């Protein structure tokens, strides 16, 4: 769902940081 997409984005940002 939309929440899954948002969590995926957050995970990607955390990986960059």
From Swiss-Prot:
Record carries keyword Secreted: yes
Pfam family, one: Antimicrobial_8
One GO CC term on file: extracellular region
Localization per Swiss-Prot or TrEMBL: Secreted
Taxonomy, superkingdom: Eukaryota
Single Gene Ontology BP annotation: defense response
Tissue specificity remark: Expressed by the skin dorsal glands.
Modified residues (Valine amide): 17
Protein name: Uperin-3.7
Organism annotation: Uperoleia mjobergii
């Amino acid at each position: 769902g939309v929440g899954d997409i948002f969590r995926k984005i957050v995970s990607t940002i955390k990986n960059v940081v």
